[in-house]
Amino acid sequence: MSGSRRLFLKELCVAMLAGRLGGKAFSSETKKIKLPIAFSTLGCPAWDWQKVLEFAHQHGFSAIELRGLEGNLDLPSHPVFAVGRIEQTKREIREKHLKIACVSSSANLYFSDKDKRAKELGDARRFIDLAASLGAPYVRVFGGKEQTDTSRFPDEQTKARVAAGLHELGNYAGPRGVAVIIESHDHFTASASLKDVLQAANSSHVGLLWDAHHPFAAANEEPEFTVKQLGSWIRHTHLKDSAGSGEDRKYVLTGQGNVPIRRQIESLRSIGYKGFYCFEWEKVWHPDLQDPEIAIADFARVVGECLGNRQACGG
């Protein structure tokens, strides 16, 4: 074969490859490397579905945690997730190269009243069905706490009810490819209470959503201790920063408070955590917080730097 023919074939192959890649094979535009970061839609209650997807895509997020949409916390009833719309919704998620990290319900499992308990478990099942339809791995539930209960820790009867609820929901979720995760929150913030409940639930379809802020801020636990106690159950995590202490503690932009976020991340890394590092900005509950356009983008920058540079995490 002559040299000119070889050159022609080489150029032809290059041209064909460039065409398959939409003409971008040799352009300066390269696909952004996405880190395992996510944000909860709790932080952007005014955004519509398209803005949620576009913002996540543009700021390098890999996933979204669904916790309400356009002010509607009852996600299964939102039109975006209706039977006739959900396939389009899934396509839109894929087109932005995103995943759904978790579908977060409001279900509380502490109730002793039979009717209230049945309602909470029923709501959790609806969210499990939605997660299964979306291909999401987890549904969040709460242990919860009576508003009139001033005790620091749940009693044995409450722990038993919560564990039984988790086990029941795990049995429902498992065959649907979903796991139920209890969040470190309310009465179930300290490692000891969570460990008791997770052990009693005794299900491979039950795990923990480690809201890393609450055990530190409310239970005075260092992240290394919490992860040592509960690491084998951690499936998903919430990260957020705050300043102050006790009742005076206020949420602030990531890195501007006194929550040891870098140590929390390193503690998860130390156990080979493979989940998402999810920003939960409680804009729904605290409307005076910074707007999500600022706070969520800031989280992507600060935690993205931490994940991309071990030295930035103190390790």
Model-derived regions: residue spans:
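N-terminal export signals
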Residues: M1, L7-S28
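C-terminal segment of N-terminal export signals and the immediately downstream linker at the start
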Residues: G23-W47, K51-F55, H59
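Conserved, mostly hydrophobic/aromatic
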Residues: F39, A56, I64, I93, ...
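Conserved beta-strand positions in the central sheet of alpha/beta enzyme cores
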Residues: E65, C102-S104, R140, H238, ...
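Glycine-rich, proline-tolerant flexible connector loops at the mouths of alpha/beta enzymes
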Residues: R67-Q88, G144-D149
